[in-house]
Structures are given as structure tokens and as C-alpha cells.
Amino acid sequence: MKKYQFLKSNLLQNQNINELFLQYLKNDSNIGVIKSIVDGVVIIEGLSNVKAGEMLQFSNDIQGMALNLNSETVSAVLFGDETKIKPGEYVEGTGNIISVPVGMSLLGRVVNALGQPIDNKGDFPGSELKQVEVKAPGIITRQSVNEPMITGVKAIDCLVPVGRGQRELVIGDRQTGKTSICLDAVLNQKYENSKNKKNALYCIYTAIGQKRSSISKLVTLLEKTNSLEYSIIVAATASEAAPLQYLAPYTGCVIGEYFRDNGKHALIIYDDLSKQAVAYRQMSLLLRRPPGREAYPGDIFYLHSRLLERAAKLNKNFGGGSLTALPVVETQAGDVSAYIPTNVISITDGQIFLETNLFYNGIRPAVNVGLSVSRVGSAAQILAIKKLAGSLKLELAQYREALSFAQFGSDLDETTKNLLSRGNMLTELLNQNRFTPIPIENQFVLMYSGIKGFLTNVNNKVIRSYENELFNRISNYSVFNTNVILLSNNEYYKKKNNNNVVAFFISYFKFITTNIFGFSAK
């Protein structure tokens, strides 16, 4: 572009000079002239050698991306303010597909969709540039999911487990707690990383189309809990251009891939992909691409599949790293059969379905256990939890079935009453406040006490008190804590001589339930 800097935009208004400049373009295919600007889409003459997805440089430091490559013109989208450029000005093709900085120096930082810092903390020393659009790992490089990714949420870790390298969709209506579940998973990694620093899990939170105030609250929460030190936030707010909201998930993904490809572990949250799809639909319609179902373009499935396929667990020959994805999709009135939800459900390895009715009934998180599923996570679930999960799922399924019949009549037999009472107790046991992740060891002890019948005669109103007291005892009683950690270890169930530990648990549960609240344990 430097050799054309003498051509100012006011000179280009002259017809003869404009024609002369277009002749220059035939000899330099990296320079183009703006023909028109409409709704953030720029039509450019020239740029005959430009690539699809190439970064373009406009005047006033405005950047854009080439998308539609026609025989005479190129259609590009802008990443900045379109009022700062005008027809007749020149455009330069950089020759590079969009790249962003990646590396350990990004930890604790907030960046925009182009990887530029927006937290006033300076640049990223020691970082390297990576293209945002790369191919997903092949079959040979992958390994089946075999390590748990502990979220700290009882309902998920016990019933819908997530493994490192898995894609688990979080789906539900607005204001049902989707973001809270994802943030609980981020907050819980502080405890998990302290137990095993070698296999620490780094977190990337990608905010797409959210309010600036929401992102500010998120940063404050992570700073207060000292969780920002292992986290990176990629933000494309609602006020930013649609191309930036479209690009943000790919930027977050390539940042996560840096950890995966270097033998480390990362978790990426896309909150949410519905807004990315809307941004891509807006871009496609402005680019005059043919609309399809719900006015989305024909390649909307590929938009999400090529993104989510990049989450993987690599085998040891390729470093053994992993990238776990928690994409979020918003539904309208619980309709999971809409276009985007069905697309993402078919791509992912399972879904956590949040229901509005459960949320309004005070069940938090509002996970519908019957509709939620994890297709590969159970292979990575801790064996101690897995032993309990089978009984827990069965009892909750029987409870839901009995509950549906109980509403039709008041005359219930004793067995059904006991089933409903026990189901209510287990449901209350799975309740959990947001931003309070629970260590997996504590989850095991709590669920063990419920499933093995120690809370059968307990009033549901005091279960939360029991839970708090139990966790206090675990943290203060060193012998008990040792056995808890032993039980959470996969090696525990591979040993035959574990009767002493089980007997210790039983006696201790009876002590707590009998002496703390004054009721008799069975």
C-alpha cells in the first residue's frame, strides 16, 4: 500500500486518475478500490489474488475480511466503523488469513474477537500468532475420552459426567442458569488445579453478543475468587459488529488449541452459539447469499461443526492434551426441535437440558435429568461416583414416573409414598446454589449418605444444614478426609480389602445423622 499512499481519496474523484489507478491494479493484485459501502459490507474492485477469509486493511486503521470472491469484485465485511471509510479509497490485502496471539501470557486477560487486549494491561509478551481457521485434529491423532472434567455441580458430575476432550451442550431457555453452570465449572478448577498442578485445566470463556455490564460482572467474579489467573476471556459484545460476534468463537478456540497442542488441558465455553448463528445469518443476508430454513444460510451447520470438532482429546504420541467444549444454545419456549438446537445437538457428545418449570419450582440447577445425556463422559467418570450414579439414576427415574401418576389421585399405597418421599429427598440433595462448586470428594460422601438410606427420615428442610455440617466435618476431621480422598480415587474399587473403609463411613454417617439433628439413622 505504501507505493499508493500518494493517491489521496480526493484525487480519486477525478475520472482520469481513477482509471489510471485501476490500470495499476492489474499489475498489483493486492490493492483494490472501494466501490460501495452498504450496512457494513464493502464492495471492492481489484484484489484479484485475495483469499477467502483474508484480512484486509482499510484507511484509518479499519480492518475487514474478504468473503465473497466474484470475477470483478470482492465483497468484504468490516470489523470497525464504516463511517471512517468511503468509496474511492484504496484497500490492501495483507495476504494473511486472520490470526490472533496465543500463549501462556494471555492467562488472566480480556481480549476482543481479534485477540487485541481490552483490559488496559498491555500486550502479550512471548505470544505467537495462530490462524483462527484451522482443520480439526484427524482420527489418528485422537484418543477416546478417559479423564474426568469435574464441574463441581452435583447434578452434572453424578448424572451427566463430562470428560476432558468432550463436547457437552448446555441448552435451555433464557434465564434458566446456563451461564451459571458454565461459570461453576470454571470456578471449580481452582480446587482441581491445586490438587494436580501438572494436569491443570485452563479456561477460556467466549462471550458472544452479551452486555458489557455482564462481562464486567464476570471479570469481577473471577478476580474475587482468584480464578482469573487460569482463565482467558474473549468478548464480542452486543454493541460490536456482527463479523466480530461471528469470529469470537474461532478466536477462543485457537487460544484453547494452544494448550491442547502443547500437552496441556483447556476448557472453552461458547456463550452462546445462538447469537453467533444470528450474526452469521445477518452477514450472509447482507452478502446476498441464498437463505434457507429460518433464513439461515445453507452452510450454518458447517459453521458450528468445524468449530466444535476442534475440541478433542489427543493421544500420547501427540502430547496427550485436550480441549473440552461447553457450547451454550438458547431455546425459545423449550423448543429443542428448532434449527440451531437440533444442529448443535447432533454435533455434540451429549446435552445438559435446563427446564424453565424446574427453575421456577426452586430446583437449582434446573437440570432435567430425563432429557440430559452424556454419551462419552461416563467412560471418564470416577469409579466411586459411577457406582452410585446407577442407583441414583434409577431411583430418580422411578420417582419421576410415580410423580406423574400421583397427581391423578390421592390414594397412594405405602410403597409409592416411600418412593415419592425418597425421590424428594434425592432431588433436594442435588440442589445447589450458583457459584458454589463442590469438590468431587464431598459430592461422593453426600450422595453416598443419601443413596444408602442415612437420610430416609430426614426432613427436606434440614438437608442443606446436614450438607454444610457434613462438609465442615470432612474439612476438620483429618482421618475422615483421608478416607474421602481414598474413596474418590479410581484405584479404590480395584482393591478387594476395602471393607474397613466402608465400615468407617457407615459408622460416621450414623454418628452425624443421629447426634447432630437428633433423628435416628437406619
Swiss-Prot record:
Swiss-Prot/TrEMBL keywords: ATP synthesis, ATP-binding, CF(1), Hydrogen ion transport, Ion transport, Membrane, Mitochondrion, Mitochondrion inner membrane, Nucleotide-binding, Transport
Gene Ontology terms, MF aspect: ADP binding; ATP binding; proton-transporting ATP synthase activity, rotational mechanism
Primary site of residence: mitochondrion
Record: residues binding ATP: G172, D173, R174, Q175, T176, G177, K178, T179
UniProt keyword Transmembrane helix present: no
Entry GO terms, CC: mitochondrial inner membrane; proton-transporting ATP synthase complex
Transmembrane domains' residue ranges: none
Pfam families with a match to the protein in the record: ATP-synt_ab, ATP-synt_ab_C, ATP-synt_ab_N
InterPro entries in alphabetical order: ATP_synth_asu-like_sf (IPR023366), ATP_synth_asu_C (IPR000793), ATP_synth_asu_C_sf (IPR038376), ATP_synth_F1_a_nt-bd_dom (IPR033732), ATP_synth_F1_asu (IPR005294), ATPase_a/bsu_AS (IPR020003), ATPase_F1/V1/A1_a/bsu_N (IPR004100), ATPase_F1/V1/A1_a/bsu_N_sf (IPR036121)
Cystines in this chain: none
SUPFAM superfamilies given in the database record: C-terminal domain of alpha and beta subunits of F1 ATP synthase (SSF47917), N-terminal domain of alpha and beta subunits of F1 ATP synthase (SSF50615), P-loop containing nucleoside triphosphate hydrolases (SSF52540)
Record's subcellular location: Mitochondrion; Mitochondrion inner membrane
Family named by the database record: Belongs to the ATPase alpha/beta chains family.
Entries under PANTHER family matching the protein: ATP SYNTHASE SUBUNIT ALPHA, MITOCHONDRIAL
HAMAP family from the UniProt entry: ATP_synth_alpha_bact (MF_01346)
Function: Mitochondrial membrane ATP synthase (F(1)F(0) ATP synthase or Complex V) produces ATP from ADP in the presence of a proton gradient across the membrane which is generated by electron transport complexes of the respiratory chain. F-type ATPases consist of two structural domains, F(1) - containing the extramembraneous catalytic core, and F(0) - containing the membrane proton channel, linked together by a central stalk and a peripheral stalk. During catalysis, ATP synthesis in the catalytic domain of F(1) is coupled via a rotary mechanism of the central stalk subunits to proton translocation.
Name this polypeptide is given: ATP synthase subunit alpha, mitochondrial
The organism of origin for this protein: Acanthamoeba castellanii
